[in-house]
UniProtKB/Swiss-Prot annotation:
One GO term describing the cellular component: extracellular space
Protein name as it appears in the record: Prolactin
Gene3D superfamilies registered for this protein in UniProt: 1.20.1250.10
PROSITE patterns associated with the record: SOMATOTROPIN_1, SOMATOTROPIN_2
S-S bridge residues: 69-183, 200-210
Compartments reported by the entry: Secreted
Keyword Signal part of the UniProt annotation: yes
Molecular functions (GO terms): hormone activity
Protein family per UniProt: Belongs to the somatotropin/prolactin family.
Effect of residue 90 to P: In prolactin-1
Miscellaneous note of the record: The sequence shown is that of prolactin II.
Protein encoded by which gene: prl
Pfam families for the chain: Hormone_1 (PF00103)
InterPro entries associated with the record: 4_helix_cytokine-like_core (IPR009079), Somatotropin/Prolactin (IPR001400), Somatotropin_CS (IPR018116)
Amino acid sequence: MTQGSRLYFAVTVLMCAFVSINGVGLNDLLERASQLSDKLHSLSTSLTNDLDSHFPPVGRVMMPRPSMCHTSSLQIPNDKDQALKIPEDELLSLARSLLLAWSDPLALLSSEASSLAHPERNTIDSKTKELQDNINSLGAGLEHVFQKMGSSSDNLSSLPFYTSSLGQDKTSRLVNFHFLLSCFRRDSHKIDSFLKVLRCRAAKKRPEMC
């Protein structure tokens, strides 16, 4: 079984785990969510490596700065120590806000992947569709976590995405695809970190053990 097949199998199992959750405790829900977020970040890293395998040098020059990511305006903790100081419901809202913000961008990436000027476009296309499916599954799982936590606040930040095209020429489309993916990879790491902190807190572990 290839690495991609193993990753797909593991994520599929985790997605199915969210289908029937009646009676499942908060600790188990957060464990499943953190495992799925970890797989999501691994998949985005694998996709980035695929793109980098044949990425034109000029693309590095054309690549927008990280501050141009559409989620960069969201105020989030910079490290684990800061995350540990944030209330659980706020931390969960941050993770859910980031997931929601990627619904439209991932739909765009999924629609563009098959026509990229890249020799690995079939693999990239397949993995991008996986990302889109998996982030929807994680979003549904976090809704269950939200309900289980019994929070009275459902304060999700709005992070609109206005781009409907990656560009007209093949280089621009490849560069913008790579840029969006790099933004998602960064955010998927944040989501994974937030969920691991929530899992740690639910298990009543000491902060230094998180």
